[in-house]
Amino acid sequence: MQAAEPEKVTSAAESTEISTDKEKKEKVANDGDNYKKFRFGGYGEMVASFKDYGINRFYGAPEGNPDKHRNTISIPRFVLALDYKFNSKWILGAEIEFESGGTGTAYELENTENGEYETEVEKGGEVAIEQFHITRLIVPQFNIRAGHVIVPVGLTNAHHEPINFFGTYRPEGETTILPSTWHENGLEFFGSFGKGYASFDYQAMIVAGLNANGFDRNTWIASGKQGIFEEDNFTSPGYVARLDYKGVPGLRIGASFYYCADAGSNSDKADTYSSTGKIPVRIYTADAQYRNKYVIARANMVYGNLGNSAKLSEANTKLSNKSPYSRITPIAKNVVSYAAEAGLNISAFFKGNKKVPVIYPFARYEYYNPQEKGEASQIMEKRCQASMWTAGLNWYALPNLVVKADYTTRQIGTNKVFGTGKYNSENEFSIGIAYIGWFVKK
C-alpha cells in the first residue's frame, strides 16, 4: 500500500490506482502523505469459481485435464498494514498477509541430524510478513529503506493490490513463473528525478537471492523465494532495479531487472550443487499503463534466463522427499509471459449523471510458458504452455471497493492466440469482491 489517499471516484471519473510502494515517492519525500503520526489499514479479496476441468492436466488422460465440473471458494489474501512516523524523516512500515485462511507450516533443517528436514506446524507458513521496514527520507531524489521489502519485478509485484488488475485473480502468467507477492529481506534505495515530460521514479535493491532448491518444471523460479526457513541464505544476493517513466499524464511505462549470480549457493545444504556449476538467474520485464476517464489499458512482458538448467534439473530430482520442494523436472532455460488488458468506463459516457454506476467491462489476453525453451538435452513439457482469454466486469461500488465477475478460457499447448489443440481447454466463471483502504489515521 502507498501513502497517498485514493483519488475520488465518481460515475464520470476514472477509478483509482494504488501505486507500488508503502510510500508514493513524490508525496512521501515531501511529507505530504495525509497522516501525521500513524495509520492502520489493509486490503483483501474473496473469490468463488465455477470450473469445468479437473485438478491436474499432467497426469491421467492423454488429452490433458479431464472434463470435470467443480466449484471453489476462497479468501486469497487478507492483508493488514501499518505505518508509523517516528518523525517526519524516519518511518516504520509493516504488512502482515494471511493467505487462504492463514494455515501452513515452516521448515527447519536439522544439521545435527544428518541434515534432515523437520516441520514446525505452529509457525503457519501462510501467515507471512509481507513488509517490515524502516525508511529514512532524505531528499525526493534519494531515500533509503531497510528490512523486508517488496521486490518490484514485473507489473503484478510492483502493483499487486487487488484494484490494480481487472481479473478476479492476479494475472496468471507472472504469478506462475515469478514469486507473488515477491518480498525479501534487504536494502532499497528509491526516489524520483526529472520534471515535466522527463519525470521518473526509480528503485534499486540488494535482497536475499533465490534458492535453486525451489525451482521446478511448472513454476520455474516462483517457488525459489526464500522465507520458509527461520533464516534466509544471503550467500549470493539478488540485485534488483526498476525504473518508471511518468512524464505524460495518465501514462506509466516501467521496466525491471533481476540478477542472482548463483542461486545454487543459496540452497539449504551447501553441497547440493557442488558438481553443477553456478546457477545464474536473469529476469527482464517491461510494462505499461495508460488511463483517462474513459479507458484503462495495461500491458506487460517477462523474459527469464536460467543458467545450467539441465544439470540443475538432474540435481533437483535427487532432493529429499521430506523437503518442501516439488522435485518436478526438467527446469527450463528460458521462460516467457506477456499479456494485455483494457477496460472501458461506461459511466464516463453519462456526464453529470451520478446515478450511473462506475462499471468497467474489460478483456484480457495472456500467454505464458514456464517451459519455453530448454538446453539441447532437455525435452520441454508442452502442457505447461497456456494461452488465455478473459472477459468480465468490474463494478466500483466505492472508490476503493470493487465487485468483479469474469469468464476465462485457457488453451493448453497450442502456441496460438486463438483456437484449440490436442489438449482439453480449461474454462471457468469467477465472481469476487476486493477492497483497499486506511481504516484509522492520526
What are these model-predicted stretches?
Residues K8, E14, Y53-I55, D67, ...:
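Outer-membrane beta-barrel pore domains
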Residues F58-G64, N111-T112, I163-P171, I221-G224, ...:
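Short glycine/proline- and charge-enriched loop/turn segments
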Residues D33-D52, D67-A212, T235-V240, D244-R252, ...:
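Outer membrane beta-barrel
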Residues M1-Y59, K442:
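N-terminal periplasmic/intermembrane-space "pro-region" immediately following the signal or transit peptide
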Residues S180, E230-P237, T276-P280:
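Active-site glycine- and acidic-residue-rich loops that bind
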Residues V121, E174-T176, Q226-E230, I328:
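Active-site rim elements
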Residues W220-N266:
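Loop-centered beta-sheet repeat module
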Residues G209-I221:
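C-terminal ends of transmembrane alpha-helices
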